[in-house]
Amino acid sequence: MDRFVSIAGDPHIGVFTRVFDDIAVVPPDVPEEVTTRYEEALKVEIVRTTIQRSPIIGSLLVGNNNGLVITGMATEEEIATLSEYRDLMLLEEGMNAAGNIILANDHFAAVHPEMDEEFMDALSDFLKVPVIPLTLGDVKTVGMAAVATNSGVVVSPRTTPGEIQRLEQVCSLPVGKGTVTMGNAMVGTGLVANRYGYLAGVGTSGYELGRIEDILGFEEE
């Protein structure tokens, strides 16, 4: 299967789309030829919407099988669309680009280290997972420096051994370093994945795909 895809010619598919085990949330104007690739590779239902009237879905949405977290600036129509699939938590104040500042799966969530304890407690209650503050190689936007599924976590190659150890302790899953699109360390910008499969931005090398498959537990094709 061809694992390479772009959104309007842009390989940063993790910025524009967000994938879960059952749905892929994409901008309304993504062509059917692209959404078909998502359906086939990831076994998902396609949900078309903007968030905050913006196409950068991946930067503004995050969550797990228990709930979705989005910017509080989402419109009523956007909230109604997403509410059909999960309960929603709205980030009303401060940093609200949820997909940038939160990394989450059904085992854990890691957040921008400047988020306060009250927020972390609320997020933990909502997603039903332990929440830790974290940087990945000194990058605070952990949601774009890594990709987490319920099978493994791909992190930036700049991630320190201590940061990897902390992730392994909180999620009890394989954690490994990887890149996309020929050396992009912000793997969350160019990779989407779930328990069934993955897609990477156009330009990702075969070696990079091999690392992704190894960490997330997919057999090489």
Curated annotation (Swiss-Prot):
One of its GO terms (biological process) is cytosolic ribosome assembly. Keywords: Initiation factor, Protein biosynthesis. The keyword Protein biosynthesis applies. The keyword Transferase does not apply. Gene3D superfamilies: L-arginine/glycine Amidinotransferase, Chain A (3.75.10.10). It comes from the Archaea. One of its GO terms (molecular function) is translation initiation factor activity. SUPFAM superfamilies: Pentein (SSF55909). Belongs to the eIF-6 family. Binds to the 50S ribosomal subunit and prevents its association with the 30S ribosomal subunit to form the 70S initiation complex. This is Translation initiation factor 6. It comes from Methanospirillum hungatei JF-1 (strain ATCC 27890 / DSM 864 / NBRC 100397 / JF-1). The gene is eif6.
